[in-house]
Amino acid sequence: MISSCPARQLWVIPATLILACTLLRGQTIIQSFSGVSLTDTTKLGTDTTPPDTMGAAGPNHFVEFINGAFAIYTKSGVRLSLISDILFWENAGISPATISAGLTDTRVVYDVGSHRWFASEITLDTTGAQVLVARSDTSDPTGTWKALHFTGNTGTRSPDFDTLGVDSTGVYIGIDNFSISGTFTGVSFFSIPKADLVANPPSLANMTRFDNLDNMIYGSELQGVNNPDPGTGHGVIIAIDNKQFQLVDRTTINGSGAAGATLGTTVDINNTYDAYPNPAAQPGGQTVDTGDDRFSSFVRQVGNNIFMANTILQGSKDAVHWMVLSEPNNTLLGEGIISDTTHDYFYPSIAANHSGGILLAFNRSGSTSSDGNISIYAAVGTVTSTGVAMGSPFLVRQGTIGNFHFAGDSAPYRWGDCSATMVDPTDDNLFWTIQEIPIAPTSWGTLVTLISLATNRPSLTITRSASNLNLSWPASTDPAYVLQSAPSVAPSATWATVPNSATIVINQNVLTVPLAAGPSYYRLKK
C-alpha cells in the first residue's frame, strides 16, 4: 500500500496533467468466468459426460472445445459464440456423413509460431473411425477454419483418446487402439508437417503414419509435446510406460517437417511416484472416476525442459504428480506430488513460462462436508538450472456440491477426462486454466481462470484520443489495486475511485474516460 503516488512518469497534454505510477504486485487470480455447462450442451442437443475439459488462449480470445460444444470468449470472459462440435466440423468442411456416428475427445491449442489454432476430435464409428484435424485461417478463432480427416486405425480397430501436439515443424496426433470387442490393442501416432496444414488448402499428403505401435515399448496415450519455441530439430513423444510403474517413455520424432518422419529409440526414464488412482471421494458418499495414471492433458516444453503431470495413488488418496524433464539428456530435473491424508487430487494440467514460472491446476475433493466438495485448486512452482520447487496448493474456486452424480451413469461417476493450463501467448506472466466443477448435483460446469505469476512492477499508461483518455495497465496486475483519480497530488487531495469497466485487449486492461477540463492525476492503489 502507498500513501502517495511518486512521480515516476509524467505526461502533459492540453488542459490535463496526468501522473502515472508503478506498484509492486504478486502472484494472484486475475479473473474467472463460467465456461460451457451441461445445460448448454443439452440445449445444443449434444449433452454428455464427462466434458473432456479443454481450452486454449490466443492473442485476443479464449477458445473452449469440449465434448459437444465449441465456444469463443473475449479475454474479459464475454462469450462471443457457442455452437455444437458437430457444427464446428461441418463449418470447417467435414461432411455430415463423416461424423454421423458421433464425436468424442476434443483437443485445441493455439500455436504462436504459425499464429493459428489447431483442433482435433475423433468419430465414434465401430470400424473405420475418423481422426479430425482443423486449423484456423488466421489468429482470430471467430473467422474461418479448414478441416481434414483420415482413418484412425488400420484393420478392425477403433481409436480412443486422441492427443494433440504442435511444435515448430509438426502437428502430432496420438490415439489408443481398441478391437471391436473393446480390447486395448496398442497405440498409433501421426506426424503431420505443420506447413502442410497451414497451407491453403491444407493437406495430409505428407503425413507419416505409425500404426499399431507396441505400447509395451512406446507407452500408452502418446503425447506429442507442445513446444512454442523455434525448432530443436526434432519432436518428442512422452507417455507413461505400460509395462511397469515408475517409468516415463520418451521417443524422438525425426524429420517431422516433411514426409517420411521417423521415430528414434525409446528411452525409459525412472521416476519415484506411480500407481493407479482410486475413485475420488465426495461428502455425499458418491465417488467420481479419476481415470488412470496417464498424461491426460498436454505435455509442454519450454526451452530445454519438458513439463508433465498425472494423477496417481499416494497411500490411500489420489495425488497430483508433476515432473520436469531435461529434454537434451533425458534426466528429471525434479518431480513431486500434491497430496494430503484427507483429500483426493486429480486431473492436473501444467504449463511453464520462459522465466521459470510454473502453474499446476487440478481438482480436489474429499469426504468432509463442504471442504470435500469437488473444487478447483492450483499450485505455483519455479524451475532453475539446478532444480524445481513447487508451492502448496491454493484455492481457485470452492465447490458448492457435495454429491455430484449423473443420471444414467453409476459410481464412480464420469469426470474429466482432462483439464488444460497454458501460458498466454502475449504475456509470459499470464496463465490460463480451464477446469470442470459441479454446478448442481446432476450437472457439471467449466470454469476459465486467469492467474498472474508476474513479479515485475506494472505501469499505468495514458494516451489521448480526441476528447477521451485511454488508460491501460497490464492484465497481470493484481485486481486488488484500484484506479483512482484526483485534481492534485497535494497531501490533502481526495482520491476518488474510477469505476473499473476495463476490458482485456491482448494483454492489457484498457479503460476509456472523458478528458477532464482541469488537471487530473491517476494512480493504482491497493
Describe every region a protein language model picked out.
Residues 456-526:
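Short, composition-biased motifs enriched in small/polar/acidic residues
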Residues 11-25:
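Bacterial N-terminal signal peptides
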Residues 1-10:
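N-terminal secretory signal peptides that target proteins for export/translocation
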Residues 13, 227-229, 473, 513:
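Hydrophobic alpha-helix-in-membranes signature
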Residues 26-456:
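C-terminal PAP-associated
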Residues 20, 141, 489-491:
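Short, structurally constrained coil/turn elements
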